[in-house]
Regions:
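Mid-domain alpha/beta scaffold segments of enzyme catalytic cores
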Residues: 1-240
Length: 240
């Protein structure tokens, strides 16, 4: 594979990568991954990825993951706005709705997500969205509140064919991860990936999560998580 790859979701501030950032990036470069989007999931990580993006000439996002929506306070909007004005920060997020485990209540998630939409409108930046087990609510919010759906990425899509069609009808972009490599959980994605237009499709690792379970390179086993995913494995997602 000669074309250089871009990993649109790397959680480089995760504890399992601490102190290894340059090694992770170097290994990715050797495996044809030229650029990364470093994702913020709360205020602290958003600050860190903005600095890392500047250091390594990548781009970053700033936002509150729905799991962390409960940590939103009266200062969060202005604090994020300040980060979003930095040169290397190019999207609002990771933000959205996750009703799978509800680490934050659905009501709080909805409210905080609407704040992120307001931030995207104020800064004219794209939205980087996380949605799990919340398709109907997410679709409704996007349809009612977002003006330019072409500036939305629904990352780590693992839903149904009907959900995918409805998202594409809105005009959003879709991100696919290593789930597509795994017959145990992602086989259904390969059955309808061809309906995603080339100009609406992104690939990502969402590392260190969602290992593609590749046979040629066994992911490193750590005490923190059973399978440590890395940006260097993006090539496996691209192959599938």
């Amino acid at each position: 594979m000669s074309n250089k790859l871009v990993d649109i979701c790397v959680n480089l501030t995760d504890d399992v990568f601490a102190g290894k950032e340059k090694n992770i990036i170097d290994a990715a470069n050797k495996n044809n991954v030229a650029k990364m989007v470093l994702v913020g999931n709360d205020l602290d990580s958003s600050l860190k990825v903005s600095s890392l993006a500047e250091q390594f000439s990548f781009v970053a996002t700033a936002g509150y993951h729905p799991h962390n929506a409960k940590d939103w306070n009266e200062k969060s909007y202005d604090s994020l706005l300040s980060i979003l004005k930095k040169n290397h920060v190019k999207a609002v997020g990771e933000c959205g709705l996750d009703f799978n485990r509800n680490f934050s209540t659905p009501e709080i998630q909805n409210s905080v997500f609407l704040n992120h939409i307001d931030l995207a409108k104020e800064t004219n930046l794209p939205l980087f969205i996380h949605e799990r087990d919340a398709f109907h609510q997410m679709h409704s919010i996007i349809k009612d509140n977002v003006i330019d759906c072409d500036k939305i990425v629904v990352h780590c899509f693992t839903g149904t064919k009907n959900a995918l069609i409805d998202y594409l009808d809105l005009g959003v972009h879709i991100g696919l991860t290593g789930w597509i490599c795994d017959d145990r959980r992602g086989k259904h994605l390969r059955d309808f990936i061809n309906i995603i237009p080339d100009d609406k499709l992104f690939i990502e690792t969402d590392s260190p999560y969602l290992s593609p379970y590749i046979s040629s390179k066994k992911p490193e086993v750590t005490s923190a998580m059973k399978h440590l995913n890395k940006p260097e494995y993006l090539v496996e997602v691209a192959k599938d």
